[in-house]
Amino acid sequence: MKSRLRFVAIGLLSTALLSVGSAPAWADDGSIVLDFVRHGQSVDNAAGIIDTTPPGTELTATGETEASTVAQAIQSEYGNGIAGLFDSEELRTQETAAPLAAELAASGHSASLETLSGLNEIPAGAFEGHATNSLEGILYLLAPLSWAFGDVLVPDVGDPSVNGVTFDDSFGGAVQTIYEGTASATGTPTDVAFSSEGAIAVWTLMNVDNPDFSVLLQEVEETEGFLPNTGQVVIEGSPGDWTLVSYDGTAVPQDPGLGTELFVDFRNLIEAPQFAGYDIYEALLSGSSTTLDTAIQGAVSQVDTALAQFPVAVFDDIIGVFGGTI
């Protein structure tokens, strides 16, 4: 990401920060720990070229060094406590994951490396191969940033068949697969998933209960991107109830403050009819009246639930500021 991309991202993130805040404290209350790791430097990455179509380009010599370094750091932190290793269909994530898989295998760890297509980068479509520091690079970012703020029906400018709903279904499906494979393990199992910058950052902000836009804004200012090569984003919890633990090494408070809590309440409220509407749209395309009826019933239930939960969530958040009493 270069200067123009940074300008756009900072503008949008700063707008979000007008209504959110953070407070210290973190508590362990999750079902699994999921450590997302961005790939090391790839050939197109180093050249500043948008590269989202698998398999993409391989790692550079620098990227290979980064992969070895992050493998040692992850093994040092989790040891043989890693329940599962995952990567995307992109060559750069597979080559980044390989050193960790090799080190774990050498130490007698039985976890195998599994490839999940849902961990692929957000498709750039018509902008594939363009410079990241270009108008096309800026347009590529607009829809994903909108999804992070709750406007999930905004289509990917480069590929209108992709929107926040389809992206969340795809990446979230991969996360669901990871969760189902390890949630029954003893204690709080840890999984490591190698993916790409945009996919990790956007899906995390869309799904955690404590999205910290200030951390992301700081990242953009310092690195001109959402996450540096081999940067890590750690979340904890279960599908539908994820908490952001740390972002590129910066601890994130579990209690994000009233502003962020109200933002999440509103995000959940406005997303429900969008997801429901897209389900109905897909059902219409199927041509099946049974599928359509099921989609409509599910949509009504989803929207009713969101409408009922919104005032309760807002009330709980507000009284929480006063220690649970008014």
Regions found by a protein language model. Give the residues of each.
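Solvent-exposed loop/turn segments at secondary-structure junctions
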Residues: 40-44, 90-93, 119-123, 197-201, ...
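Active-site-proximal alpha-helix that buttresses catalytic centers in soluble enzyme cores
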Residues: 29-115, 229
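C-terminal segment of classical bacterial N-terminal signal peptides
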Residues: 2-10, 15-25
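Sec-exported extracytoplasmic/periplasmic mature domains
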Residues: 72-80, 98-106, 176-184, 205-209, ...
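Extracytoplasmic/secreted envelope proteins and their assembly/folding machinery
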Residues: 67-71, 94-97, 168, 172-176, ...
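Acidic, low-complexity terminal tails and accessory targeting/binding regions
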Residues: 28-30, 123-132, 205-326
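Phosphate-handling substructures
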Residues: 58, 103-173
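Beta-strand elements within well-structured catalytic alpha/beta cores of enzymes
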Residues: 33-41, 86, 185-199
